[in-house]
Each structure stands twice: as C-alpha cells, then as structure tokens.
A protein has these predicted regions:
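Hydrophobic alpha-helical transmembrane segments
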Residues: 100-111, 138-194, 201, 255, ...
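Juxtamembrane intracellular "pre-TM" segments in multi-pass secondary transporters
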Residues: 1-10, 190-223
C-alpha cells in the first residue's frame, strides 16, 4: 500500500532530477563546446542569449500547451525533442555538418522545450503529493531540494564528464537525461488535459497573468517574490563578483562563497520541508527578507574569508524557503485547469527578473 502511494511521486521526482541534472551539466558542457567549436566568445555569448530568450518564450506558451493537450504528451514531446536537439550537436559535429547557425538552432530548439516539460511535471505535483499523504508545502520544498541538489552537483559532474569524455559526448549524456525524463513523465502523468480548451487565445500568457492579477493573495506575493528573486539573482551574478574584483579578492574565494550560498539554500529548503507547515508563510517570508537584507549589508563590507563564507551560507539559508512558499501558494489557490498557464507565467517572469 505504501509503495503504491509513494511510487508515482517518487517517479515524478526522478524525472525532475534527471531533467535538472541534465540542464546543470549542459550549462557547463555547452559553453565549453561552443567555444571549442567556434573559437569565438561572441558566438558563445550569442548562443547563451538565444538560449535564455528561447527558454522565456517557451515558459510563456508552455503552460498553455500543458492545459490544452495534457501533461503526459507535453512531458514526452518536450523530453524527446530536447534530447534530440542536444544529441544533434555532437552528431552533426562528428560528420562535419555543424555550422555556427545550426549550433544556435539546436540550442534554441532544446531550450524552448525545457519550460513546457517542467510545467507538465510541476502541474501534477499537488495531486501526487496528496496521493502520497504529503502537504503541498512539503511537496513544494522537496521539489526545490531536488532542483538544488542537481544544480549543485551538475557542474561537478559536468566537469568530470568533460575531463573524461570530452564536451561532445557529455552533451550526449544530457540528451539521454532529457529523453529519460520525458519517458518517466509520460508514464506517471495523466494523458488528458484538466479541461478541454477550444480557443487558441487560452494558449497565450493572458490567462495566467489575468488569474495572478485577480487573485488577492498571489498578486502581492508574486510581486514581492519577483522583486526579491531579481535582487538575489543580481547579487550573485553581478554585484558580488564586481565587489570581489574591485577589492582585489581571489576568484577562488568567490567560487567558495557561491558554493556556501548554494549549500545554505539547500539547507534552508530542507528545513522548510521538515517544519514549514508549522510556521506561517508570513513569518517565514518576514525572516527571509529581513535576515537577507541584514546579511547583504554585512556582505557589502567584504569581511575576512571565514566571516564571508558564514554570511554566504546564512543568506542562502534564509532565502532558500522563498521559492517553495510561492509555489505552495500557487498550488493551493490555482484551479487545476489553469495551473499549467499560471506556472508558465510565473516561470517566464522569474527567468526575466534576474537579467533585468
């Protein structure tokens, strides 16, 4: 009985992990391959920018595809198409048929199908969590733990794979992860949509935006978290590196600081998964926002390495629970027939927040 209740959620989490670890490995292997193939930083930058734009567009429209065609078909197609796109890169390169524009086309195709696949998986989490006897808050936190573990372990795994096999075969491994994630998703997810959709307008982002705007809790919560995520993302990718460079600090210190923040975030999510249901979301967010503000103020002084690492872990710990809290609120307050579009809208806006 216990296995029947937990196995669907475990299968979906396995698909999520494969998807995330594949993307984390590709985030290292793909730039390495592009630079080796094109010998141009400009082409590497163009490839990265094209990938981000394709991912955001895929997030905008992907939720509507999930709600219209069903979760299993979208998960399967996203995984297979993304895998084929990644596998095409080393295969075309092996036969000497990979041009720079063809390389970008493969990357864009794979990136565009990332978000629909994740929306298909995430839309079913509340139901499978209920079957497993877990609260929405705990399921949301467990999913975040899986994503963070993949994000932390992916670069190390990617570096080892590139060192042993090379960048091209490593991209083949990411393709395998994508296809397997799609197959697992198709196996455990429902094939039919939550409700039949008859108009193409509902495929757009408008339905998701309209619902978020009209929902009295989600509207302010989403706005606050979006700003917070944008600031935290800018801190990690722009502000802290700039401070380190201006102060003449070592790049190894920056790398260790980033790792400590990631480890702290993982611990924060794990704590929220364990005791989050006992504490109100309002109190969690108040502690996260105020604590991270104080931590960021102290970080701006660039203290010695031990204190710097401790502050990095502390800020990560405090901010780790923010995303699971938002996701849990979305799961609790969004009708099933709208969940794909709402998740797609949230994903697209969050992806846009940090670059802006």
């Amino acid at each position: 009985m216990s296995e029947r209740r937990y196995s669907p959620l475990a299968t979906l989490f396995a698909a999520t992990f494969l998807f995330r670890i594949g993307n984390a490995v590709a985030a290292l292997a793909l730039p390495w391959f592009v630079l080796s193939h094109t010998k141009s930083a400009a082409w590497a930058g163009a490839t990265a920018a094209s990938s981000v734009i394709a991912t955001i567009i895929g997030a905008w429209v992907g939720g509507g595809l999930v709600d219209r065609f069903g979760r299993a078909p979208v998960a399967l197609i996203s995984g297979v198409v993304g895998g084929v796109a990644m596998a095409s890169i080393p295969l075309l390169d092996a036969v000497g048929a990979l041009s720079n524009t063809g390389l970008i086309a493969c990357v864009v195709l794979g990136a565009a199908f990332d978000a629909p696949g994740m929306a298909a998986q995430d839309s079913e989490l509340p139901k499978l969590g209920h079957v497993a006897g877990l609260s929405v808050e705990r399921v949301s936190s467990l999913k975040a733990v899986i994503g963070n573990v993949a994000s932390l372990g992916g670069p190390a795994l990617g570096g080892a794979a590139i060192g042993l096999l090379g960048a091209a075969p490593t991209l083949g491994l990411t393709a395998f992860c994508s296809v397997l994630a799609g197959l697992l998703g198709a196996w455990v997810l429902p094939a039919r949509a939550a409700r039949t959709m008859t108009t193409t307008a509902t495929l757009s982002m408008r339905a998701g935006v309209a619902f978020l705007w009209s929902e009295p809790l989600l509207r302010p919560l989403f706005g606050i978290v979006m700003i917070f995520v944008g600031i935290v993302g800018a801190n990690g990718s722009v502000i802290m590196p700039a401070l380190f460079v201006d102060a003449g600090r070592q790049v190894a210190e920056l790398g260790l600081f980033s790792s400590m923040m990631g480890a702290g975030g993982l611990l924060g999510i794990a704590i929220h998964a364990s005791v989050g249901a006992r504490i109100s979301a309002q109190n969690w967010l108040a502690v996260a926002f105020c604590g991270s503000a104080v931590g960021s103020l102290l970080l701006s002084q660039l203290p010695g390495v031990p204190v710097l690492m401790l502050l990095g872990a502390l800020v990560g710990l405090l901010t780790g629970s923010v995303s699971p809290i938002l996701n849990a609120a979305i799961y609790n307050r969004t009708p099933p027939e709208l969940l794909g579009r709402v998740l797609g809208t949230v994903s697209a806006v969050m992806l846009s927040a940090s670059p802006m």
